[in-house]
Amino acid sequence: MAITLINPEGLPEIDVYRQVAIASGSRTVFIAGQVSWDADGVTVGAGDLAAQVEQCYLNVATALAAAGATFADAAKLTAYVVDWTPDRMAQFMEGVTRAARKLGTTPAAPATLVGVQALDIPDHLVEIEAVAVLD
């Protein structure tokens, strides 16, 4: 495996991701921001943050698979969420949990969540991008 995830001593341990990803592979995969579209370009879960997060993670998994990667190869995840407030974390994590169940894995790469005013299409509440490293 080209990625080793750790929580170093001196930094808080976060349940849903690791603080550091050590990449030893030779190929880097950059996944464009994935929104909650299905394969036909139709928005999934309009107005429902959990449903959109779930679809975004499923789309990231599809993109990773096309490159021969999985979430185990992810070195960094970044989520952009419209009108973010901390009280929406439970909805966000519900979507992550549902996607993880469907995928049979829990994304644990270092992650950043950024609140934004808007995304490209008004129905989109979240966009998630990934960087993965392969041997």
List where the protein language model places each region.
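N-terminal presequence-like segments and the immediate start of the first folded domain
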Residues: 1-58, 62-76, 82-135
